[in-house]
């Protein structure tokens, strides 16, 4: 048991260090260098001046990856915020109000989750002009369902507990019950799901950009860089390997962090149940 939580603490440290490094590096690179074309320096090899070399337009690859992190992570955070707001709100009302609202939401979720997520995202993104902002809409439309289902499940388990019954008996406003009493109960589980989904959403954004439905040139974004590097996989593989490696490492870190948070949450719930 001690080894498990020691491992989890190490994961949390790596996660924090990764976020810290990504933030600090933003201050050492210029966004202008990520988009400025310099045809006299195309395909420069790896050096102290260009840590990962340059691309076919003479742009520094390391700079583009760091600036691309800003685009990818910002859109991911924005998407998660939209997903959580919609999903948790619907889940709270569906779990509390019951009746036709709950049935309608559940039937919609059953239909939505019966279709592969990525297929729906591609279909939705195809209706819009390719951009990162449209990816936010396309991903949010399908991903909120998991949060609604999780929230409703937790609310259902809390509804028969004495503190909720007492609040209803004393005619406490529904808004107060939802915000002050039920919302704190769902926050830990929602945070775990958010961290796990963070890696998934990065993968979705990168994949949609890779097939031309997301970020467009010259915007530095990891998926768009993969698409660009695909054409030079034989002659200059670093253009493909660099963004692919960053995507893989980022997803791995967030997935491991999500697993560690889930372990800690389950441990806390176990201790709570034993004490009650």
Swiss-Prot record:
It is found in: Cell membrane. One of its GO terms (biological process) is nickel cation transport. Keywords: Cell membrane, Ion transport, Membrane, Nickel, Nickel transport, Transmembrane, Transmembrane helix, Transport. PROSITE patterns: ABC_TM1. The chain crosses the membrane at residues 10-30, 73-93, 108-128, 186-206, 238-258. It is a multi-pass membrane protein. Pfam families: BPD_transp_1. The keyword Repeat does not apply. One of its GO terms (cellular component) is plasma membrane. Residues 69-258 form the ABC transmembrane type-1 domain. CDD domains: TM_PBP2. InterPro entries: ABC_transport_permease, BP-dependent_transpt_permease, MetI-like, MetI-like_sf. It comes from the Bacteria. Its main location: membrane. The keyword Cell membrane applies. The complex is composed of two ATP-binding proteins (NikD and NikE), two transmembrane proteins (NikB and NikC) and a solute-binding protein (NikA). Belongs to the binding-protein-dependent transport system permease family. OppBC subfamily. NCBIfam families: Opp2C (NF045474). Part of the ABC transporter complex NikABCDE (Opp2) involved in nickel import. Probably responsible for the translocation of the substrate across the membrane. This is Nickel import system permease protein NikC.
